[in-house]
Structure formats: structure tokens, C-alpha cells
Amino acid sequence: DNIDEIIPNIEMLCENPGEKFILAYCDNPDGLLHKFGTDSTEASTYIKETEQKIEKMSKELDEDTIVIISADHGHRNIEKSYTLLDYPEIQECLILPASLESRTVAFWVKEDMKKVFEERFNKIFGEEFWLMTKEEFLQKNMLGFGKKHPKVDDFIGNYIALSTSSSMIRIETFLADGKPVKKSTHCGLTKEEMEVPVIVIKK
């Protein structure tokens, strides 16, 4: 997860004979963006320094080597952070605590309170989150196309709320509240989170 360790390993693997596909993942800049935000000096400095290191590595690799750089998601600075601990009227509707991600929140709602939950949630969060039933969520292929994993139904509850704004709903319980709020995060539906670069370097 350290770029200064990743690059030497890539170079070493490239020296081995034969064709190969090397996949490398680095925890940063994701970790720095979570901690300091998208407009932070810490994140921008890291990215600039990493660009220089990758450029140097690319020049030293054989001419038949192609380097592809991308990300698994973008990032969005958080401007408003909610906790469901402040909304007992929402908690009352739930079988168990919400889960998944702070910008893609899964709810397990009591069967006899589904209508009430929809009305209450949309009244409080409707301008910042898009609430869908599990069926709507899956019909819209929000998890992609192909065969559905057999555990999907166990993980996504019967309602999903997706952030369409700069807001998040913290995943907290009364036993573990007060966690530090991330300056920036992902998993919502904004352009900043969903669009990623694809950089191709070849000689």
C-alpha cells in the first residue's frame, strides 16, 4: 500500500521473462482524501509526487510495457453529516441498525412501517438522498449487470438510500457514536464520485 514499495516490486516483476499482467493497488490518495479532503495540500502534494515517481518508473521500463492508471472511485467533500441517533422517528421503523456506507445506506425496515419510513425519511432527507426499495435498486442495475450474487439480499436490506448531495449519514449505534467524520468520501451518486480518470502510458 506504499507507492515507494509498489514501484520497485513492479520493476522487479517486469524484469522476469515472458508476458505478464501486473495489478497494483495503493491506499493513497484515498486515505489522505478521507482524512484531509479533496482540496487539501496533503492530498495534492502526494498526487504530484506520485506522478513524478510513476513517470520516472515508466521511462525505465521496457518499450513494450504499457502502464494504465485509474481509480476504483472518485471523492466528494462532505458538507453535512447526519447521525440517525438524532432521529428516533427513523430508528423506530428499523429492525436493526443501518449499514453499508455513509453515502449508500442500507435499511432493514419493519414490514408494518414501510410506508411510515418512506414518508419520514423523504421528509427529512429527501432533498439530499434518493430512497429506493431493494426491488427498485436491483431493477435499476445499481450493482451492475450479470448474475446476482446469492448474498446480495442478505446485505442490502429492504431499502437503500443513495446520496445525491454533499451529505452523509453516519453508520452509528448508541454503543459506538462520536466517530470522527471523514472530510471527503465516496459511494454516492455525484459526478465527482462516479467519474474516474483512465491514464495510459506507452512508449
Ranges and model annotations:
Residues 1-203:
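Feature captures the catalytic ectodomains and active-site-proximal regions of enzymes
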